[in-house]
Amino acid sequence: MAGPQQQPPYLHLAELTATQFLEIWKHFDADGNGYIEGKELENFFQELEKARKGSGMVSKSDNLGEKMKEFMQKYDKNSDGKIEMAELAQILPTEENFLLCFRQHVGSSTEFMEAWRKYDTDRSGYIEANELKGFLSDLLKKANRPYDEPKLQEYTQTILRMFDLNGDGKLGLSEMSRLLPVQENFLLKFQGMKLTSEEFNAIFTFYDKDGSGYIDENELDALLKDLYEKNKKEMNIQQLTSYRKSVMSLAEAEKLYRKDLEIVLCSEPPL
């Protein structure tokens, strides 16, 4: 049980700073899996109800179960019974609303990969703090949101604290992709079938018949189908087209190089 010193941040239904938003998220996502679910969701909802009553808001129903059902219908956009960070941003609007700014700019996986390509300039498989800062600066300009240097620094540090799961000061592609809504996050589809460097090199070499160091769109098509079949997973034509388009966003002149595909398919980004 939480003691008096461990009470959750008060859920004011007013504007929040990025730091306050993070405090609320970290408190309720106790297991750090990127969702609020189960008991976490129940605790979150109870605190939300307290905050609403504290601010004088009146609910239509006194039944907690009915309120939760109504709440989930409104905010659980992909109907998975969980609340993800981007969904929570709608419930608790932040002063800066940097998450929604981000999603507005990279609302699809294809746009996300194009943005990733632009800012992962050294092809390391990571966006580092200085690259992330430029990324966020561009997003804020695109959304016509005024900001100063200290505020931009706060956004950068907040995003790092949210998504830098191993604390190395960098954001990997899979970490950064958590900013996308689940239905747009094609990278999640490759979870559970990530390849070791040896496995990846073998499959890439198989499809790179001429040893050019890159594959084209048709070869990627075949590679993805092969990968799914080997892992006994189903994928329809629409999904295949979507995944291929997203991955090809990393290509140069329709050429997808080994290092770019390795970022997506390997369990660890290339060294």
Swiss-Prot record:
GO terms for molecular function: calcium ion binding; calcium ion binding involved in regulation of presynaptic cytosolic calcium ion concentration. It is found in: Synapse; Cell projection, Dendrite. The keyword Phosphoprotein applies. InterPro entries: CALB2 (IPR029646), Calbindin_Ca-bind (IPR051001), EF-hand-dom_pair (IPR011992), EF_Hand_1_Ca_BS (IPR018247), EF_hand_dom (IPR002048). Residues 16-51, 63-98, 107-142, 151-186, 195-230, 235-270 form the EF-hand domain. Its main location: other. Ca(2+) 5 binds at residues 208, 210, 212, 214, 219. Ca(2+) 3 binds at residues 120, 122, 124, 126, 131. GO terms for cellular component: cytosol; dendriole; dendrite; nucleus; parallel fiber to Purkinje cell synapse; synapse; terminal bouton. GO terms for biological process: intracellular calcium ion homeostasis; regulation of synaptic plasticity; synaptic signaling. Ca(2+) 1 binds at residues 29, 31, 33, 35, 40. Ca(2+) 2 binds at residues 76, 78, 80, 82, 87. Calcium-binding protein involved in calcium homeostasis and signal transduction. It plays a critical role in buffering intracellular calcium levels and modulating calcium-dependent signaling pathways. Predominantly expressed in specific neuronal populations, influences synaptic plasticity and neuronal excitability, contributing to learning and memory. During embryonic development, it facilitates neuronal differentiation and maturation. This is Calretinin. It comes from Bos taurus. The lineage of its organism: Eukaryota, Metazoa, Chordata, Craniata, Vertebrata.
